[in-house]
Amino acid sequence: MRIGIVLLPQDRWAQARERWQAVERWGFDHAWTYDHLAWRSLADEPWFATVPLLAAAAAVTERIRLGTWVASPNFRHPVPFAKDVMGLDDVSGGRLLLGLGAGGAGYDAGVLGPAPTPRERADRFSEFVDVLDALLTQPVTDHAGTWYEAHGARMIPGCVQRPRVPFVVAANGPRALALAARHGQGWATYGPAVDEDATATATAQEEWWRGLAVLRDRFDEAQEAAGRSVRDRYLSLDGAPVFSLSSLAALTEGVERAAALGFTDVVVHWPRPAGVYAGRLEVLEAAADALPSLQAVLPAARD
């Protein structure tokens, strides 16, 4: 099992640098940051841009893989974004993982104009991923679609990783699952939505795990339909009602249950002092000490 961690882009670099270096030193396999202009309950708090943050993190680390959790077409155009991706892969020495999602409702969805309908959002995401794939696998791309155009778009010399950086496609719905099966080197999910207000936390937690097993089966079906096998499966444990780093026991249980469902990777969040992802640094440090045993957990084999 590989263990990753999200560091929200809220801190000035003087502090953030120490955290990115710490997670590499502790032995995490990958580290991520969100790709938003502002995010949910933190919209009025400090929030920095994704690409320069990842470039800075790449410059002060050596081994750990780095990625977007996740980039979306809410405010990204594939042509300039592909150039950024190519640059990040170069600066990191081929350590970039490109997490991609359709983009949900909220601040980012309407910051540049009217938000798309759910159907439009799915259509746009499909074209976004298709165009990114083309841009990152060939030196010159031309495309004229419903949402995007590219005319002689150059991506030279291309990515360090070949044929391109790995796509980790976040997906829950049928169309996104099909897209992940078609283009992804990895599938990512936060798991199913559960109504935490209507039930006890422990009950909601079990409901989440049951729904996750259903999602896993649906992705298996999407893979079969696409005629591909997506090796890597990433689970954000913090899609569940119980915060992954509420205790070391909670993290251990999450890793073991994720492995039993065939996930190869889990992702947690650096604890915040209050609000979303609230937790204690001592638990993160205990988790860091326990990483070798957690990473020794083997994902269940898939047929």
Where are these regions (language model features)?
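Active-site-adjacent structural elements that line small-molecule/cofactor binding pockets in enzymes
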Residues: 1-303
